[in-house]
Amino acid sequence: MNAEIIAVGTELLLGQIANTNAQFLSEKLASIGINVYYHTVVGDNNKRLQQAIEVAEERADMLIFTGGLGPTKDDLTKETIASSLEEKLVYDENALALISNYFKRTGREFTENNKKQALVLNGGTVFANDHGMAPGMGLNKNGKVYILLPGPPKEMKPMYVSYVEPFLRNFTTGENIYSRVLRFFGIGESQLEVKVQDLIDGQTNPTIAPLANDGEVTLRLTAKHQNVHEAEKLIQHVEDLILERVGEFFYGYDQEFLHYKAIELLKKKGLTLACAESLTGGLFGNQVTENAGVSSVFKGGVICYHNDVKQHVLHVPEEVLSTDGAVSKECARYLAENVRELLKADIGISFTGVAGPDASEHKEPGTVFVGLAIKDEPTVVFPLNLSGSRQQIRERSAKYGFYHLYKKLEEI
């Protein structure tokens, strides 16, 4: 079954709010085997909404609407759909009682426009709104399924989970969709694709979808099957083939981001970390502290943006700063080693470089050095040549820091 999501609201077209409902619904629908091929956004206008309905009916089996169920004049979703389907709107007694009781409790006047929220499509299934006023509804007519949901995510999401998904399962084959995301770093999207292109071209179940994002690449493996264990077998087989070829760049699954994986490995090894940040200006330390319980492994950091701090706090020799420069392999080495000693940590990591937009010390933007000093191990400095905006270079430098930290920890 194919679905189209139609988000109703002029505020969406104006960019005043993001259409997060479509993302949520697409993911949920995919998990129960309903394909979403189109997202449509239309303003609070009867004529344009009617046009959107007519177009969607030509290309989808299921039309899912969000928004436009409220009490105001521009909330016209159910009125437009009722007119299109030649169905009556009737009051749902449970919803009407809920709304009436709310106004009684709050001592406010129960006006006719608020009463409007209890109107539902005649003959449809009503979805209770446990977090708001306007109920949702579902109707199967003329070979199409129509689903109407409230716009506020705090109302729509729990309504979908509790009432809508069980209703939708009546229209599915029972074949569910299962996905697993493989995360890679240190290899470009085009390079990775070349290595697994035959697998991408030859697979239909599971499918393989690459995506590049901020210096890393993901592969989403998606399988369809009625049985979750069989779907996992399909995915595992393809995953094994992929990792045979590019396993050296693999670091995690799904939402296991680099900073999470690195910190979890630090905890597992029982090692502590300190950072010296010039180029990144605290970005690395900020991401470290996004992990719960990180105080057990993170000693702290020094933002050594000015050369005075590099020299007098982290004891980078003046001759290194004057000869090699602050953006150099030698400076990165001193920063990593000395912040480790200063904060009495097992590992010190440092970042120095040129974020741009202008060159510095006759070095081009994107010139970066990441130093890694591990107790009882030789210090390693990783030179990087990054591209992008000033912010992208800083963010990617921090990611490379987590990546090299993670890889070194795997070796210990």
UniProtKB/Swiss-Prot annotation:
Q: What is this protein called?
A: Putative competence-damage inducible protein
Q: Which domain of life is it from?
A: Bacteria
Which family does the record claim for this protein? Belongs to the CinA family.
Recall the taxonomic lineage recorded for the source organism. Answer: Bacteria, Bacillati, Bacillota, Bacilli, Bacillales
Q: Which Gene3D superfamilies match?
A: 3.30.70.2860, CinA-like (3.90.950.20), MoaB/Mog-like domain (3.40.980.10)
Q: What InterPro entries does the record point to?
A: CinA (IPR050101), CinA-like_C (IPR036653), CinA_C (IPR008136), CinA_KH (IPR041424), Competence-induced_CinA (IPR008135), MoaB/Mog-like_dom_sf (IPR036425), MoaB/Mog_dom (IPR001453)
Return the SMART domains for the record: MoCF_biosynth
